[in-house]
Amino acid sequence: PRRSSSAASDVYKRQSYNWDYTVADNRIKKLYELGKELNWNGSIDLNWDYTHPADERILETDDELPHETLEAYENLSDEEKILFDRHDVAELMSQFLHGEQGALLVASQLASCAPTYNAKLYAASQTFDEARHVEVFNRYLQEKIGIHYPINPALKSLLDKILTDERWDLKFIGMQIIIEGLALAAFSMLKSISKDPLLKQLLHYVIRDEARHVTFGINYLEDFIKTLSPEEINERAEFAYEACVISRERLINTKSQQRFLGMSEEEAREFQLNTGSFEMFRNFLFSRVIPNLSRIGLLTDEVRPKFEALGLLEYENAPDDFECDWAEMRKPLEEFEKIPV
């Protein structure tokens, strides 16, 4: 049965006690148990004794990065190119750090306002996961790079949008589907081009956690959204679309290019917006978001043309994250030298 809008609103806008402690033996419970099995300690399970050589790049791709074709980059000395690489990585990872702090805050809110016992337990376990992610990203930036960048205004806007909305399910959509889905794709891509084995190990462990978070969000939201009225579903679909628009802007980081390539902020932004490989990178990240929005019923007729205009509907039929490989997820943590590519 569908809830009335007013009744639903009352449920969304209050902190939610749940005095029914019946443990539902379902996928949410299994994900919670899996999280307990796979807890790792950021202080001792990562090889902090390793430091990447100062004269080597942290990231390296098979093809040239777009900025490497510019005359301003070619004019840099070898030492300046290495320093640019460090700043580029620091700017990107600083946004990861800020995003993980946002995820920490939202997960703690979900433990308070999620309506069911199982969801509260899972949100509490995710809160600890996010705290661990903040810890390890911050330590890597502080100890291994020594450079820190402030939060991207678009990311701050997205986090504020999610944190200040009083409806628990919009927090789920914004965090578990949009932000965590984008993070999962971004972390996977960065891991694939990292030449620093410590960074590769760090990202691999974080990715294992994030995969559980996204699967939790999809499994919990799919059934709930079916109980909403068409108007409420469209409202959430519009929220998801707006979050995706902000997220595309979040993916544009300009500070390191301004510093080393002599670009203005607008020039650096336009360069990234108008460079095909950057566009492909941004769109690729949504390959982990769009199929999940489709799975939970938020690619409505009203928002489909808007996603089409962004060039993102091509991912609609890509694999979603509803199902997970339980055997793969239960594997013991890989050792430092054995992290898969």
Residue ranges and their predicted role:
Residues 71-95, 153-177, 193-194, 242-260:
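Acidic/His metal-coordination segments adjacent to aromatic residues that form catalytic metal sites
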